[in-house]
């Protein structure tokens, strides 16, 4: 059986919540790919005593310890110094490593501070874990029988490069797991976690593969995880479960893994050879940004209009002024007029529009913060939906979820139009 691993992330900024700990997430996924079990993650500040305490605990329960952070040149970068003190060995300066660090500074035409020299000081007996992107090398060290320590800088890009080039080969040679864990994540929109869990309850009791639901930012994910001798074997276990789950979810499932509602909608536009124009008010360009962030957006996106002011809704989109007086700018009739106007004026097949109250101010009893109207004009009738998101989660969340909801409306209607030649009611 492969030794288990523990992830030890060092940095006071992590404890204070100033930086999101993406390194731990990355390492957890990579360990699973290698079939190396890991049961604990620890975050500790830049304090030698507490780092040593965390090491003591980790050594008792794991044979592989992966640390991130604390490899820089400043006084609070203490990882290698603390490791050396903990195992009672001296720090040894590596002249070749120091020369490499100096060369990095010359390449960047920057002066090297004397404090950077300490990055060439490593615990005696440790092997250098090269950093192809920065000046902070890590180490691969087996300070005692049954314990391997690998250190990485806290900068995610540097840590990932070092992981792929040096750490993975070392861990594979060390034995890796006889089995690997492989996952597929199905992504859903327009359904609650509890409702989806009820529909797939039978699969949640599975053992291999397992199925686990989790929700966030308006969407629900189903993670299917298989344990097998290799990726191909794991895929063969996942495939039939994935097919069944997709059938049960129907249109609520929009993709898997790295798919987004924007990419799913874009793929449908490309497949159907149709074009899109968008008109935004409350989202302020977020919908257009989601679409243009994808390569090849010019194939399907005609353009976008951000019309915040009411007079611009009239002059740019052709929304009748009296309609806004009668119904208000945040209303279904205005959303419909915006969608139809942008479709006509930008000569696109589809026109998608949003208008709403993002907050924190501007809401009323009749039109509270979080009220958003979305409309889609297309080859058939114009469709409109109203969503109420509440004010509790804040302006940015309302704008992001509104954007995703608009893309979901577009996705569903294109699928219906492609299948039936008409736009169907949801």
Swiss-Prot record:
Gene3D superfamilies: 3.30.70.2860, CinA-like (3.90.950.20), MoaB/Mog-like domain (3.40.980.10). InterPro entries: CinA (IPR050101), CinA-like_C (IPR036653), CinA_C (IPR008136), CinA_KH (IPR041424), Competence-induced_CinA (IPR008135), MoaB/Mog-like_dom_sf (IPR036425), MoaB/Mog_dom (IPR001453). Pfam families: CinA (PF02464), CinA_KH (PF18146), MoCF_biosynth (PF00994). Belongs to the CinA family. HAMAP family: CinA_B (MF_00226_B). This is CinA-like protein. It comes from Gloeobacter violaceus (strain ATCC 29082 / PCC 7421).
